[in-house]
Design a protein with these regions (language model features):
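Domain-level detector for secreted/extracellular nuclease and nuclease-toxin modules, and
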Residues: 2-341
């Protein structure tokens, strides 16, 4: 890992809050091209599921056992570590779910998604067949019970059940909208000032991109970034847990990686990566302050985002469009959303 990248990732957590995050993750002075890729395909019909293979490759097979030392002549081999797999493979397991409107990978340790992938188009957002009032938060029975985030974990926790794929992005179908309410699509998020405010404005920005681009793909997920302890000047990863007993991790930050496609075969893709702290953010804070090098998100998350896209097809999103939010009060936004049903 380069010293520059370490500094970017570490410094983003050195001081809590939006200002420090934005300052440390800033692209100012960084002329490197964003290193990501996303295959450009014709926008599917709104009701069609998005295959995981469009964004991420299939997980690699379990590694083969290392060669063992030669056994003594005429005797049994000394050890057989892979014999343990007769009783079960320990993992880790990433629960991959393909929904009608998104694909997600679930982290059994934190009880949050690793990532969620969605695809929005002008056509998909123009249909209002889903009614949020008919959707309910539900536990995901596809996740083994002992690894599952539960409704009671969020009860009186002080955190919102924060959608990673927004319900408003899947309003073209009631079933698709309902699937966004699985707890496997949620993370604990600060409510006032973030989930109900700045984060919601950010989601709206993503939807508004479809006025300029015919196809927009978005990867969203949590981060758990280190912070320097002033007592000993060392770096620690520290985050709250909710639930009784503690069960669900509270992310320190959230990322979005945006692929805005021009719709042409082999055409350009405008890429934008953003990291926001899980904290109250003033509505007058410029969105572009949270723009980061994509490599920083990859280093911090341990993920790679579509590395098959040639460099010559990549454009910087915020150089191609106005990266800014439009502020709407929560009550006004909910009322407006309800009228569209």
């Amino acid at each position: 890992m380069s010293k520059a990248t370490i500094a970017v990732i570490a410094a983003v957590s050195a001081a809590g809050g939006a200002a420090a995050t934005a300052a440390m993750f800033s692209l100012k002075g960084d002329n490197k091209k964003i290193d990501t890729a996303a295959p450009v395909v014709a926008p599917p019909k709104p009701a069609a599921p998005v295959p995981a293979s469009q964004v991420f490759s299939a997980p690699p097979p379990a590694p083969a056992a290392a060669p063992l030392p030669p056994a003594p002549a005429g005797g049994p081999k000394l050890v057989d570590p892979s014999g343990l797999f007769e009783y079960g493979f320990p993992g880790p397991v990433a629960d991959l779910a393909t929904r009608q409107g998104f694909v997600s990978s679930y982290d059994r340790r934190t009880k949050n998604p690793h990532w969620t992938v969605e695809h929005i188009t002008p056509e998909s957002l123009s249909i209002s067949a889903g009614d949020r009032k008919k959707s309910q938060f539900v536990e995901d029975d596809a996740i083994p019970e002992k690894f599952r985030g539960k409704l009671k974990d969020y009860f009186r926790s002080g955190f919102d059940r924060g959608h990673q794929v927004p319900a408003a992005d899947c309003k073209w179908s009631q079933a698709a909208m309902d699937e966004t309410f699985y707890l496997s699509n949620m993370c604990p998020q600060v409510g006032e000032g973030f989930n109900r405010d700045y984060w919601a404005h950010f989601e709206d920005f993503c939807r508004r991109l479809t006025k300029q681009y015919p196809s927009v793909r978005i990867v969203t997920g949590p981060l758990y970034l280190p912070k320097r302890d002033p007592a000993d000047n060392k770096w620690y990863v520290k985050y709250e847990m909710i639930g009784q007993p503690p069960n669900v991790a509270v992310p320190t930050h959230f990322y979005k990686v945006i692929f805005a496609e021009d719709g042409k075969k082999g055409g350009n893709v405008a890429l934008g990566a953003f990291v926001l702290p899980n904290a109250r953010i003033p509505n007058d804070k410029p969105l572009q302050d949270f723009e980061v090098p994509l490599e920083a998100v990859e280093r911090a998350s341990g993920l790679e985002f579509a590395n098959k896209l040639p460099v010559q097809r990549r454009k910087r999103l915020c150089a191609e469009t106005n990266c800014s939010i439009i502020v709407k009060e929560y009550a006004e936004r909910q009322k407006s959303f309800g009228k569209k049903q």
